[in-house]
C-alpha cells in the first residue's frame, strides 16, 4: 500500500462519497406522507436574501462583479455584506497637515454603484478604523489586508465622519433607496476585530455614537448590532440600548457550524455541528423575545456549513443537503441568514492559491460554479408557502400558481461517510391528481459537481478560461425528466448527501 500515490483529501472524500452514494442494493422505502391540502405558513426565502463576500475593495474587480450577477440572477440574492468600507485602501478618511478631516467617497461610490447596477443592495458593515482616526495605530488585525481595529481617537471626528458618510449616501442615491439598506456597526467586537478595552463597554460606546448620528441624519436609516461572533452579547446589547434609549432597528450576530458548543452556548452539551447554527439562532430568537424590544428582526450576518477541516466540505455537494436541513430547522426563527460567502474572491488569508481549497464561496476562483452554487439554485425553486409536514428530511412548499415544490435530502456528516448509505423514500400524495408527471432535479456526485472534470484535466492550479468553461459545462444540471406518479406515490432513492427537488403540478 505504501507504494501507491497518495490522493489529496478532497479527492479521497469525493471518491468515498461517490462509492457510498451508489445504490448497491435497494434499501426498503421509508414512507413520507405529503398532503397538498395541508395548512400553510409563509416561507420567505431567508437563506438566499443576503450573502457575505470578500472585503469592500474587492467588489471593484471584474470577477467579483460577474459572480455577483450569477448569484443574483440564479439564486435571488438581494443584499451583500462585506468588511472594510472604511479601510484606508478605500480612501474615505484622511487628515491634512492641521489635523482636519478630509473625506473622499470616490471608491465608495464605485463600490455601491456596482452593486446597485446588478440589482443588489449593500448591507453596510461600518468597519474598520481609518489609521489616522485610530486611537491605537498599531492595533492591526492579522488578516492579509491588515485592517486597524482600534476605537477612534476622537469621537467628535468619528461622529463627523458618520454624518458625512450618511449625508453623502442620501445625496447620491436618495433617502427612498438608502432607507432600504441596513447599517451594521462593526464586525465581531467580542473577539480580535475590536481592540477596545474593556471590549463590551467600548463597543457600546461606538454603537451609541454611530446609531445616534445616523438617526440624526435621517430617522429612516436602519441601524443595528452587535454583530458579534458565536452569538454573544445579544441580551446585554438590548438591555443597554433600552436603558440608554439608543436607536436599534435590528439585531445581528454570527454563528458557524464549526463554532464550539462551549463558545456558542456556554455549555458542554453534545450538539452535532449540523445542528449548531439553527440551535444558536433559536437561542438568540428567544433572547430577543425576552428583551425590552421583543419585535426586532434577527439577521444572522455570517454562517456556513461545517468545514470538516481538510475534508473541504464546502467544495463538494454536501452543502446542498446541509443547507436544506438548515432551512427546515431555522424557518420561523430568523429574518435573514447571510451565507459567508457568495464567491471565493476573498483574501483574508492571502491570495487564493488554487480553485478548490475549501473556500467559503459558492463560486470558486475564476468563476467555477461549485456544488454549493447548484444546491442554492435548486432551493431557490421552493415556493413561498410552506405546507405542514412532520418529516425531518422534507420541505414541502407551494408556489403562487399552486405547484408543489418539495426538497428531499439524505444528509450524512463527512466524518461518518463510511457508515452512511443511500435511502429510498416513497412519497404518498393526497390532494393531487392520479397519474400526473413530476419533475425531479438533484445535486450529488454526478450532478452539479465540477470536481470529477477538474480531476480529469489534471487538477490545474491555474485553469485557463477554456478549462473554466469546460468545468462549468460539465457541472451544469441536466434537464429533468418527467416521472409519472404511480397510484399517487413516488419512489425516489437518495444516495449519500443528495439533494433532490421534486416539482408537482396540482392543476
Residues covered by each model-derived region:
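Glycan-recognition surfaces
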Residues: 247-264, 274-278, 317-347, 366-382
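Active-site clefts of carbohydrate-active enzymes
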Residues: 258-268, 285-321, 344, 349-363
